[in-house]
Amino acid sequence: MDKEWLEVCIYTSSEALEAISGILYNTGVKGVSIEDPKDIEFKRKHPGDWDYFDETLLKVKDTAIVKGYYKEDDKFNEYLDYIKKSVSNLDQFGIDKGEGLVEVHEVNEEDWENNWKKYYKPTKVSNKIVIKPIWENYDKKQEEIIVELDPGMAFGTGTHETTRMCINALEKYIKEDRTVFDIGCGSGILSIAAAKLGAKHVIGVDLDPVAVKSSKENIKYNNLDNIEILEGNLMEVVEGRANIVVANIIADVIIFLTEGVKAFIEKGGYFIASGIINSRKEDVIKKLEETGFIIEEVREEGEWACIVSKIN
């Protein structure tokens, strides 16, 4: 029937989630969902940080799972071969692929469009910021700042370690008169958090038009008028300088961007870089220092690092 879809499930490790998501985005995938047991474990250990807990989530296996959704067409088998080969090759890049098993199932459209939402509940990710899906209710505490988010199927929910570390760093370094640039804005979560934490002006950029659309929609949900979202890369579409540039991407992209990013940061400003697997942390630090950045602090959570550096 015309509402049937093919679901490709990749059983992997938390470390490989972003890499495998990237593999799927290189194909004709229509949606991606991620089930990370580390997110569920984080929530179980921090019961005061969130509003609701579904006990059935404790039954989720230790294995992380990435699911991609496809319409069955002539290219599907080609996509599947590419996925299997790419997942198998992750070890060559020093990424633990875990089980690395790839399975295919038939699913109904309604199942994959909505089932992922049961894993996404209001979560406190910093001293002030609570990420709340737009379909959930939440009783706000006096000191809390609520970020309304509908990530859709294509973007993270804001509970990943890398996002949490970025938000905590933004909370520490943002002042009311500051300008923030967000590289690879995705759902817009960091741009929105920056604005709600008091940034005067925020510019988010992303190469993906789907991300640009998602960011703009989420900004509307939060009733903000001081965020500008642009399609393209920072060097080509943004003018001027920021007090803070934040990039939650991957180590290789951060290393590539470092020299160019320097020209977009005000003297005394900060570069908050995350999405860095711990095994690549020293490579990023070395590049930052070679480029003239001073390392302000290094945050670590799980297998990930967030490096805050400064231009004097």
UniProtKB/Swiss-Prot annotation:
Transmembrane segments: none annotated. SUPFAM superfamilies: S-adenosyl-L-methionine-dependent methyltransferases. This is Ribosomal protein L11 methyltransferase. The lineage of its organism: Bacteria, Bacillati, Bacillota, Clostridia, Eubacteriales. GO terms for molecular function: protein-lysine N-methyltransferase activity. GO terms for biological process: methylation. GO terms for cellular component: cytoplasm. Its EC number is 2.1.1.-. S-adenosyl-L-methionine binds at residues 163, 184, 206, 248. It is an enzyme of class 2 (transferase). It comes from Clostridium botulinum (strain Langeland / NCTC 10281 / Type F). It catalyses: L-lysyl-[protein] + 3 S-adenosyl-L-methionine = N(6),N(6),N(6)-trimethyl-L-lysyl-[protein] + 3 S-adenosyl-L-homocysteine + 3 H(+). Gene3D superfamilies: Vaccinia Virus protein VP39. It is found in: Cytoplasm. InterPro entries: Ribosomal_L11_MeTrfase_PrmA, Ribosomal_PrmA_MeTrfase, SAM-dependent_MTases_sf. It holds the Pfam family PrmA. Belongs to the methyltransferase superfamily. PrmA family. NCBIfam families: prmA (TIGR00406).
